[in-house]
Amino acid sequence: MRNLYLIRHGKPQYPDEHSYCIGQTDFSLSMLGHLQSVLLHGELDDKITAVYCSPLSRAMETAAHITPDLPHITISDLTERNLGEWDGLSFDEIRKRWPDIYEARGMNPDYPIPGAETPFASGMRFSQAIYEILRSSEGDIAIVAHTDVISSYLYLLDSKQHARQYFRLPCGSYYHLNTDDNDHVVLSDLTYLLPHPDLHDELCRMLRDSVSLPHHVQAHSDAVTELACHFCDLLESHGYFFNKKLDSLRSTPSRYCQTSKTSHQNRW
């Protein structure tokens, strides 16, 4: 049995505050998208032996964060569904230009988009890519792709139980699937997962570095952390006990720290 992680890329950077229909339109990750990808690294990096991804920038950038020490293998058939005449347009513009189709899709999300690849075609394309990847690889692997092709693929495997929209997943989340001894994908718990890794020092630094803070901001952050830890050392020498690395990041100290202060206030 092998583990297969189907991951949706981190949140992309849109041109403005509007929401966009971005099938194969190539947007890079936003600041939040980079942070989401580093959290995926914290959760999955030591669990996988290879990572495959869509050729779109938002997927490749996510894959690079997840396994910085492993090359990510780009597979064209893992790309997002082509959304035809709507691809790359804001939903406000789509609503104005195709009001009837927009309304129809509000009732039926699979109502055809002009010129778009069908969900079935994109699901079959993605399914064939998964088959080839499993056939030519070993160990536990991650696939970094997109919500539409992932949901279309899972719907093909489980259409008797759920509608296709059931399988859509938020940016920076993933499905954890397994294979049988013949490398056939086995569906069990089909609940998407959000990463919740332990926030150790190295991961916190990776989160900070992923958003490319200006040097002076980064230096200020380091100086504040150093000073906060110095204050914590001073307090600990007078009987206060708490986790200085975590409490220095909180606006309000932990309850354990407050309790310690009350019980040791006479030791000053």
Feature roles, as predicted:
Residues 1-2, 75, 81-93, 155-211:
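Acidic, low-complexity terminal tails and accessory targeting/binding regions
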Residues 8-61, 113-126:
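Loop-to-helix element that buttresses phosphate recognition and phosphoryl-transfer chemistry
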Residues 38-102:
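Phosphate-coordination/substrate-recognition cap region in phosphate-metabolizing enzymes
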Residues 48-55, 140-144, 245:
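Short glycine-rich phosphate-binding loop at a beta-alpha junction
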Residues 60, 68, 127-184:
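Active-site-adjacent alpha-helix immediately C-terminal to a catalytic or transition-state-stabilizing loop
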Residues 101-121, 207-212:
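Short glycine/proline- and acidic residue-enriched helix-loop micro-motifs
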Residues 199-223, 256-267:
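Active-site flanking loop/helix segments enriched in acidic
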Residues 237-268:
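Divalent metal-dependent catalytic cores for phosphoryl transfer on phosphate-bearing substrates
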